[in-house]
Amino acid sequence: MKRIFSLLEKTWLGAPIQFAWQKTSGNYLAVTGADYIVKIFDRHGQKRSEINLPGNCVAMDWDKDGDVLAVIAEKSSCIYLWDANTNKTSQLDNGMRDQMSFLLWSKVGSFLAVGTVKGNLLIYNHQTSRKIPVLGKHTKRITCGCWNAENLLALGGEDKMITVSNQEGDTIRQTQVRSEPSNMQFFLMKMDDRTSAAESMISVVLGKKTLFFLNLNEPDNPADLEFQQDFGNIVCYNWYGDGRIMIGFSCGHFVVISTHTGELGQEIFQARNHKDNLTSIAVSQTLNKVATCGDNCIKIQDLVDLKDMYVILNLDEENKGLGTLSWTDDGQLLALSTQRGSLHVFLTKLPILGDACSTRIAYLTSLLEVTVANPVEGELPITVSVDVEPNFVAVGLYHLAVGMNNRAWFYVLGENAVKKLKDMEYLGTVASICLHSDYAAALFEGKVQLHLIESEILDAQEERETRLFPAVDDKCRILCHALTSDFLIYGTDTGVVQYFYIEDWQFVNDYRHPVSVKKIFPDPNGTRLVFIDEKSDGFVYCPVNDATYEIPDFSPTIKGVLWENWPMDKGVFIAYDDDKVYTYVFHKDTIQGAKVILAGSTKVPFAHKPLLLYNGELTCQTQSGKVNNIYLSTHGFLSNLKDTGPDELRPMLAQNLMLKRFSDAWEMCRILNDEAAWNELARACLHHMEVEFAIRVYRRIGNVGIVMSLEQIKGIEDYNLLAGHLAMFTNDYNLAQDLYLASSCPIAALEMRRDLQHWDSALQLAKHLAPDQIPFISKEYAIQLEFAGDYVNALAHYEKGITGDNKEHDEACLAGVAQMSIRMGDIRRGVNQALKHPSRVLKRDCGAILENMKQFSEAAQLYEKGLYYDKAASVYIRSKNWAKVGDLLPHVSSPKIHLQYAKAKEADGRYKEAVVAYENAKQWQSVIRIYLDHLNNPEKAVNIVRETQSLDGAKMVARFFLQLGDYGSAIQFLVMSKCNNEAFTLAQQHNKMEIYADIIGSEDTTNEDYQSIALYFEGEKRYLQAGKFFLLCGQYSRALKHFLKCPSSEDNVAIEMAIETVGQAKDELLTNQLIDHLLGENDGMPKDAKYLFRLYMALKQYREAAQTAIIIAREEQSAGNYRNAHDVLFSMYAELKSQKIKIPSEMATNLMILHSYILVKIHVKNGDHMKGARMLIRVANNISKFPSHIVPILTSTVIECHRAGLKNSAFSFAAMLMRPEYRSKIDAKYKKKIEGMVRRPDISEIEEATTPCPFCKFLLPECELLCPGCKNSIPYCIATGRHMLKDDWTVCPHCDFPALYSELKIMLNTESTCPMCSERLNAAQLKKISDCTQYLRTEEEL
């Protein structure tokens, strides 16, 4: 909303003012204040007239058409009438001496009702000038009233009476009310069925508190509504919509109630629109909006949804409060009076007038203001003030035109300013105008006038200055027109579209349509045109080839069309109506020819008129005088694609393909990375004949075959031939054939049909295009017919296919003749043909046909002739010709035939021949049976059973051995034949259960079989075997019980089996039983701790296993078995590490000390005494962990330290050896030397080298493993025992323990295994690690 003017007359200040809009047109506004003058302004705030009054204005009103303004004033008995058409004022004497108090024009007639302070009434007919005075209508002042559509007049007065009179002044009804009435209105009452009745209901405010309803049809049954006291007084109310009342209260409340029967007074909406006060309500049915004012602001809401606040206008300068609101009937202007005596007029709805030329737009931004802008090129908008409210606007490259009726004003558009050029009158009322760079074309009354805009500047020839279309002799009316850079184009009521070429000043093209052309819309270049005919059908017309293309799904409500101005989308245009925009694309070059497609539709906001389309962005003009940009739904891909998912991208890809934006589609396919999307893009390229782009796409997805095909055709210039190839690639073969036949190479149609094996079509084409190809096509067609079972036609085509000069082809045809002859029943001809034919395959195929026809003799003859011995023998068997079968048997490979032959020989009692035939037939059961029953050769039968694993054969052999009393062999073969129950019973009866158990343990056996064996051994008190089979059948509790019962001779095996049982069972009760047994709780004899360790490992209880491992290692260490202790700790360390369980510090420390001890031997052996000495010092400092070898270790430490030059360390450990408990145990070989070291001490010492901590780079001794700087335990090198260095890191590829890369390489020169895990290792397997971060995790991180 925009304030267009304010009226601030000095004489009005300090008092409220009255005002009234001219009805219908709203061109005038009558305003009066305390100055005894009614001033009449136009809609732009210019004063047009005034009426001088003898006193203050009492009331004023416009008649229904807005032609006459009636005014009454104090101190006067005259009614003042101002005529809007003549701008003259007349006076009418009321004929009564009373002071007038009320005035109102009728809604439908020219009746004026005037009431007086004494209750008298005057009805004046302005049309006939008849006056009807009615005395005593009321006893006191008439204060309010209203007319209805039937010219009934309702009046209210200070006498608390409501009267209803007709236009003659006769009283029809009168009703007494309890308070003084005000604001009286007639309205339509809604009945139960919601149908409208006549205006028979009167609503009136009583005492400013109550809303009273009087039904003229039921005057004795009035209704009233009272409201909450805190709402204040009723200020005003308005009827709207379907029987609803909108009521404003002085305290700012705003209420909507229903008046439907049964709903009277039901509240629909309530809001406190204004905090302190509300002074007025105004409803615009045209805009469907309501305005309220108060608290120095105006609020406008939508009647459809009152919660929707359309706009809020603040008037901070009006500090004395606001007055009354009023709309013009068209809803275009809203006037507001104020308590201080000012009046403001706001523009609420503008006529949507606008035009576009290329990317420049011009649109109405106020009643007398046009804005010219170029949003695409970023030019600053230029505002042009115009002299009149325009009915039309046009913009060109350099000019702007506005106008109304038959007159137009032209302006020159400069860079930053606009200059008025001239105005021009036309011969009729202008419907529309179009601008060219030099010319303007105006359409009026069925004609178009083309004229120069600046004729004096161009120095043009006189005949080229102006021209009127159509010519005098042309009896048509022009209905629409357009100007492009080169042409004037217009459409007529006779259906002609004319192109007038401005440069040559002559017509160059015309198109005749069957019905009249209502609207035309050329594209920016004028090479294409959309027109709409009187049937509301849309077409695209191309003047270049004079072709039209119907626009599909074209809505009959379409108001206009805009072409895309973005140069890359030349064929895109939109058609719009009030609700939607439809995006169309004109595809000029497709394999199906030129066509128009509907790409999609976009919902347009209310009252938006499209002005410009650029790259999918639609610039629309709104009622508020602004422009709003919306993106078409068909161009959703122009938004950011980064966060778009595949489900949203696929519809966008389809949009791109419809719009022929292949580069954008390529990017989407790249993001989707989906072969289906790439194929869709490729097919679209083929459809649009974009061969190069299609090659690029198919190359991207690796479709080599089609890339090669497209490369071969891309240079073809014949449009139809190229389109035919592409149609074929897209599987549209009928289209491809039509295109090929229309091209310069029609034979391509025949080649395509042959490739597709469409032989019927190929034969039809060959008759005209290549008669010499008919035999070859006939043969192929015959093959297809044969396959379909049409043997008659197949035979005919085979016969047609014989050429006589093409041997290979003729042989194929003769083979077909032979087969079809047999199928048709001409067996002799077919067989003779097949026997003469050189093909073996033909003989086989004909033999098969004959065999199906039960012609066995001929079939076998052909099979044998064709060397198909299996088939021949089979047919001979069917005909019981065993002699022939026997002759063919050496050549037969089919087991089935051998079996049939074997059965025949067995029946004849020829067992040796039968057994050979059975073997050839792989019928081992029969072979075994014959060896056992007839040939008495059990050895051969047993060998065959073992080789073939025949179940039935094994049963037969088992029965055979059972008869011989060989129970072990019988059990073996019973198990082999899956007869486990029989084998078990036999083993039980003959005490052969061990054999049965051994055999069944290696078989795929059921739990029931294992349980049977376990129960047998349990009965025999063979606990180990019983436990083993209980374990196999999953009965863990019973298995454990038996293992624990085993005698001590089987103790080791039994405990191992018990551990396996508990590991599988994962049962806490069983686990505790076994632990108690291992700890000696049952028999007082604890078992070796290694079993407890294995138990915990089996249960995957790695922490408990670790504790046990530490105990075992400690025992091994105490016993002097240091390598065993090291290996136990290492294996546990590796297991815990693989399970990602934290390593106990005691385990890690013990492993490090033991490993240091092991390293001593390696370094001393290699002659590196310093490294050996340093490790011995570490071991000697933990000497309590080596109780079995304290003296030897200390002795070695003293010797190695002395050798390495660590004299002070040697002295310290020598002094320790001199203690009484150790002195006597020193080896005599070293005793004197050590005593000498103690007596003559040398405390010189080579200082230990320092190296940086890998965590914090603090320098510390190289054998120190705890950093004083960061307090971290540093990993140690498994080759030297020193702490690790960040830049010299490697790990053993087997155990993953770290080592100094340089030192481990040196060690591997003499050693072949890892010092930690003892796995084989060489220097080539080592890799230096540049980033050792993963090995430097602190304990907190772990």
UniProtKB/Swiss-Prot annotation:
Positions annotated as WD repeat: 11-51, 52-92, 95-134, 137-175, 273-311, 317-356
Cited InterPro entries: TPR-like_helical_dom_sf, TPR_IF140/IFT172/WDR19, WD40/YVTN_repeat-like_dom_sf, WD40_rpt, WDR19/dyf-2, WDR19_WD40_rpt, Znf_IFT121-like
Alphabetic keyword roster: Cell projection, Ciliopathy, Cilium, Cilium biogenesis/degradation, Cytoplasm, Cytoskeleton, Disease variant, Ectodermal dysplasia, Flagellum, Leber congenital amaurosis, Nephronophthisis, Repeat, Senior-Loken syndrome, TPR repeat, WD repeat
Tissue: Some isoforms are tissue-specific. Highly expressed in the prostate. Lower expression in the cerebellum, pituitary gland, fetal lung, and pancreas. In normal prostate, expressed in both basal and luminal epithelial cells. No expression detected in fibromuscular stromal cells, endothelial cells, or infiltrating lymphocytes. Uniformed expression in prostate adenocarcinoma cells.
Database matches in Pfam families: Beta-prop_WDR19_1st (PF23389), Beta-prop_WDR19_2nd (PF15911), TPR_IF140-IFT172 (PF24762), Zf_2nd_IFT121 (PF23145), Zf_IFT144_1st (PF23146)
The UniProt record lists the keyword Cytoplasm: yes
TPR repeat segments: 736-769, 775-808, 840-873, 895-928, 951-984, 1020-1053
SMART domains xref list: WD40
UniProt protein name: WD repeat-containing protein 19
Source organism of this protein record: Homo sapiens
Lineage: Eukaryota, Metazoa, Chordata, Craniata, Vertebrata
Gene that specifies this protein: WDR19
